From Swiss-Prot:
UniProt keyword ATP-binding present: yes
Reactions mediated catalytically: 2-formamido-N(1)-(5-O-phospho-beta-D-ribosyl)acetamidine + ATP = 5-amino-1-(5-phospho-beta-D-ribosyl)imidazole + ADP + phosphate + H(+)
Annotated organism of origin: Vibrio vulnificus (strain YJ016)
Gene Ontology cellular component annotations, sorted alphabetically: cytosol
Name this polypeptide is given: Phosphoribosylformylglycinamidine cyclo-ligase
Subcellular location: Cytoplasm
Pathway: Purine metabolism; IMP biosynthesis via de novo pathway; 5-amino-1-(5-phospho-D-ribosyl)imidazole from N(2)-formyl-N(1)-(5-phospho-D-ribosyl)glycinamide: step 2/2
Length: 346
């Protein structure tokens, strides 16, 4: 035995259980606001219970998990934590809507070297706000204080979401046909992708995040939360024959559009059908980034691309605009030759 008679505690090792309990009390109100009628019980149990909505005849569960990448580093540098949770929810639920699924519930994982209750409460309040925007319930989560694993009060977040779709209504891209129209739904900014390049551009150019651009600071443009498309997209799906939806995330146009296209088809995008939001123009100029690389890294102002019959395109655009989205016809589906790229931007 050691000659040291002092009694060690978990807190001495860097884990403050009282801080964790204080956080749970702080976030209870935010979590309660996200509740759906299918949720059984409150937070704090070992597992969270949720019934399936009764309106589905053959319900299929759709799941997704994601993080926010190095956008988090920017939030830490700017000491602004109240919207990063919205990003986290958006990255998960927007992947579900691609298959026509309505998000049901969400869980989060928050890991840090030393728990700052105020910062964590801000993050989780943002997660709750994202869940409200998406119409899903925040039913549980894990807060892990891990001294020695993270530097100081640095933290990381991950999210997990489950949604439901009627089996016969699953959107999987198999109906995509030559001649289909492509409509774009506008993004709110870079969303949560490409931030390693964003940070490199800031470093190499020496740009100041407090510099003004179109009435806002560069930092504000870059921390603008990811748009959550659930409510407007569900309305569109209800009223139109949607053949495919692509969520433009990491890998941009070149990587994400082909994921929903059948073999032998390609998306022909009219690059002149929209003007890039100013933040993308600024990033390209400051980083001297080639246009193809921009399309391969960023969403360039396009959050979703939707394939549907040509004769329904204008009505779908009008509906999305009525729901407050920026939407426009961005291109069409054409036949692709063997070995040809599935995305063509003119």
């Amino acid at each position: 035995m050691s000659g040291n008679n002092s009694s060690l505690s978990y807190k001495d090792a860097g884990v403050d259980i009282d801080a964790g309990n204080a956080l749970v009390e702080r976030i209870k109100g935010s979590v309660k606001r996200t509740r759906r009628p299918e949720v059984m019980g409150g937070i704090g149990g070992f597992g969270a219970l949720c019934e399936l909505p009764t309106k589905y005849k053959q319900p299929v569960l759709v799941s997704g998990t994601d993080g926010v990448g190095t956008k988090l580093r920017l939030a830490l540098d700017m000491n602004k934590h109240d919207t990063i949770g919205i990003d986290l929810v958006a990255m998960c639920v927007n992947d579900l809507i691609v298959q026509g699924a309505e998000p049901l519930f969400f869980l989060d994982y928050y890991a840090t070297g030393k728990l700052d209750v105020d910062v964590a409460a801000d993050v989780i309040s943002g997660i709750a706000e994202g869940c409200i925007q998406a119409g899903c319930a925040l039913i549980g989560g894990e807060t892990a204080e891990m001294p020695g694993m993270y530097e100081g009060e640095d933290y990381d977040v991950a999210g997990f979401c489950v949604g439901v779709v009627e089996k016969e209504d699953i959107i999987d891209g198999t109906k995509v046909a030559v001649g289909d129209a492509l409509i774009a739904v506008g993004s709110s900014g870079p969303h949560s992708n490409g931030y390693s390049l964003v940070r490199k551009i800031l470093e190499v150019s020496g740009a100041d995040k407090n510099e003004e651009l179109a009435g806002r600071t560069i930092g504000e443009h870059l921390l603008e939360p990811t748009k959550i498309y659930i409510k407007s997209a569900l309305k569109m799906i209800e009223q139109h024959d949607i053949h495919a939806i692509s969520h433009i995330t990491g890998g941009g146009f070149w990587e994400n559009i082909p994921r929903v296209l059948p073999e032998g088809t390609k998306a022909v995008i009219d690059g002149k059908s929209w003007e890039w939001p100013v933040i993308f123009q600024w990033l390209q100029e400051k980083g001297n980034v080639a246009t193809r690389e921009m399309y391969r890294t960023f969403n360039c102002g396009v959050g979703l691309i939707v394939a549907l019959p040509q004769d329904q395109a204008e009505a779908a655009v009008a509906l999305l605009q009525q729901e407050g989205e920026k939407a426009w016809v961005i291109g069409a589906i054409a036949q692709a030759e063997a070995g040809e790229e599935q995305v063509e931007i003119n």
